[in-house]
């Protein structure tokens, strides 16, 4: 990202943080330049659905390395289904590929798909990859 765009982005985020009625945390790193921007970056927040992007990154990393086949089928049984958003909870036992689970995790924020993919991606690996970035 060029310097002018970076300055605009930085200014917009800093303005939003000042105007926001609450506590906001944002951390950005331009992977091409190494530039970083952080507003309350040392504060801890509940991850909620924001964890879904790092999980997706880890799945992609493992697929690219050849250690994970996204076409692998996984059967999701009722005992692992959770409430909240998503469609898997409404189905009986269902067999889906890892790719399909990832698609549901991102497109409809499916919490059951997310939980299944956490086990596949391995949360320690997800955290390590995020630290590397």
Show the residue positions of the predicted features.
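Active-site-adjacent loops and short helices of periplasmic peptidoglycan-processing enzymes
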Residues: 1-133
